[in-house]
Amino acid sequence: MVSFITSRQLKGLIENQRKDFQVVDLRREDFARDHITNAWHVPVTAQITEKQLNQLIKGLSDTFSSSQFVKVIFHCTGSKNRGPKVAAKFETYLQEEDITSKFESCILVGGFYAWETHCRESNLKLIVSG
């Protein structure tokens, strides 16, 4: 099941230097301008391709220990279309491959817009520019 995470909750993960999550930014051109600290860029037009999905799984498996449970947090600009679609496809893949015990598929509520607003209102420096 796909879960949701708020900007406030994500801020807590980053500030506490948790090592059990990975943010995946699905925006195409906007990532180069600014993005969430340590986010991975997987540019998606409408839906993630099989090649991108396989590369993402490989990257996660190479980065995180096999015994570690990892929250994979997807977002696009507003997390109303691409973010939820990709998170759902990722979740389906986890179920088909029987690896739901390793990864959790999450959506950042409100996407990058909500994150940017939260950072601005909280005077946080958790956005990387250029």
UniProtKB/Swiss-Prot annotation:
Pfam families from the entry? Rhodanese (PF00581)
| GO terms classed as biological process | response to arsenic-containing substance
Q: Does the keyword Transmembrane helix apply?
A: no
Give a yes or no for keyword Metal-binding in this entry: no
Instruction: Spell out the Gene3D superfamilies in the cross-references.
Output: Rhodanese-like domain
GO molecular function terms attached to this record:
arsenate reductase activity; protein tyrosine phosphatase activity
Protein name per its UniProtKB record: Arsenical-resistance protein 2
Q: Which cysteines are joined by disulfide bonds?
A: none
